[in-house]
C-alpha cells in the first residue's frame, strides 16, 4: 500500500510539473519542433524568387553602398525581367551621399516596390504608418512594443508604396522560429515587410487585426485568408519552402509574375540568422513568412494541446507505475522509451498532416 501512495505522489508531482510548464519543458517542445522542421521534404515556390547582390556582383558593379540612381536602375532591371513586385529589404535612413535620392524616389513612386524600416530603442520615430482596422480586445498588452521606429528619409518614404518592418523574434536559445507580423511604437501599429508585400500584392490600402482576451488571434489582408498568429502577433515560420536564387550581375531568367526579393549576400553585407534548419540569410525569413501566409497553412499550436499533453503525461505515468509495481522495474525501463518515441512520432504525424 505504501508503494502505491508513493507512486500516486510521483504521478501528481509529474502532472504538476507539466502544469507549471517550466522553461526546460518549453525548450524540449521547441527542439522537437526543430526536428520536425528538419525532417520535412523541401518544396519549391513558383511565385517567389531571390536575386542576390553577392561578391561577384560587387566586383562587377562596384563597391557598396551604391548611389541610389544605380539602385533604382537595378530595380528597373528586375521589373523589365517580369517581376510583379520587387522587395528591397534595405533601410534608406540617410540622404544619398551622391545626391541621387530623386532617382530612387521616382522609381518607387511608379512601381509596387517594398522597402524596409526597423524598430529602434531610441524614442525618435520616423517610421511610415500604415492604416489598420482592429477588432476585439485591446491589443496593446500583447503586441511587441518599441520606443521608436527608424524609417526612410521623407523623400523616399513619401514615394514608396509599401514600407515594412524588418524585425525577428528569437527564442530563449537564440534560434529564430517565429516572425512578428506587426509591432507597435508610440501607440501606433506597424506591419512587417511580409505583410506589406501581401498588401501591395492584393492592392489594398490597409490590414486588419483581431485580438481576443488571450492576445492577438489573427491578421488579415482583405483579399487573402486569415493568418493565425500567436498571442503576440507572431507567425511560426515553415522552413520547407525554397526559392530559386539568381545573381543580379548575371542575365536574369523570365521572372514574369514573381515576387522578387533583392538580397545582400556579399561578405560583410549579409545578415545571417540562426534557425532550426541552420544559419540562413534574413531574406530567407521573408520568403518563409510569405510562403507560410500565401499557402494558408501556417504552423499553429491549438489551445487544446496543453490539456492533451497534461492528460498524456498523467496516463503515461499511471501506466508506468502499474507496470513497475505489479511486474518488475525493467518492464518500466522498456516501456518508458516506447512512450517517448511514440509521443515524438505522434507529434511528427500531427505536424505533417495537420
Model regions: which residues?
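Non-transmembrane functional regions of envelope-associated proteins
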Residues: 2-223, 255-332
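A general marker of short, structured functional hotspots
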Residues: 135-142, 232-235, 341
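Substrate-access "cap/lid" subdomains that shape
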Residues: 209-251
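Active-site proximal loops enriched in glycine and acidic residues that flank catalytic Cys/His/Asp
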Residues: 239, 263-264, 354
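Hydrophobic transmembrane alpha-helices
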Residues: 320-354
